[in-house]
Amino acid sequence: MLFDRYVKNSIKGGTRDKRKEKKSTGIRRNVDNRDQRIGNWERFIILEDNKASLAHFLSTKISESYSAPPGRELVINGGFKETLKMWSSDTSRQDVRELASDHEEADTRIVLHARDTAARGYKQVNILCRDTDVLVLLLAHREHLCQEIWMFAGTSRQRRYIPVHRIPLSEEKRKSLLAFHAITGCDMTSQFYGVGKVLAWKVFEDAPDLFEHLGEESQISADVLAKAEAFVCKLYNPGTQEVEINKERAAAFRKSKKDLDAQPPTQDALILHIKWANYQTMVWNKALEPCPSLPKPEDS
């Protein structure tokens, strides 16, 4: 059982704040007993403090009462108030502390635990999750995971089983996959208006090298920035040789002045977007590290 952590002044926190602007006001509730009535669930779950309280309650109560069947192990991570606290039902494990992590997202923590499964000799790992970001993370890091990686998505009525290990992906594309996903839109970054993943993937297939080195360093170099800008130019005009987004924007505006939202972004706006995507890619690249060294978002 893996939970998100709720860190203030983070990229994830900023994303949650934007989502809250479109919703009703939350109601603060501290969850401290199993008979407690939550009331309006939507107004409860909108507040980070409520979600953190619920995660801590579940983590504490389950760890106190759970009795694992023979041959099974339950690990709980991310839900306790203490950042590095985690719990395993297998009291004989000597290496369990290696899973103590300070990841903000459960997405990356899933990959960390999946790698632990492979390190312990298991050949197959099953992951219950409906998040596209997790699927992309598993693909990007699958060389460090089990031989078989199954992701259980869908709903209880319509289940979907994704064999991650069978998805064809060249090594060049695998190395740039996280950067591609961050640039074209994920939970943390916005999507370019009118540019879906299918179109973006077609452009990516022809030029995966344009994301080389994105997410490797917190301070993005001029060369990496220029390659990412050239990729975005191709998103709006796949056949273009233009590498400057302002020129591509001007050309698109001359062709059609009706839908301004569908025009390419300005270079200033795009640079901020690329820097944001670079930081998120760096976080994902470090998913296998329990306590990765990351700069503050405002310093990147």
Q: At which residue positions do the language-model features occur?
A:
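Noncatalytic, typically N-terminal accessory segments of nucleic acid-processing enzymes
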Residues: 1-300
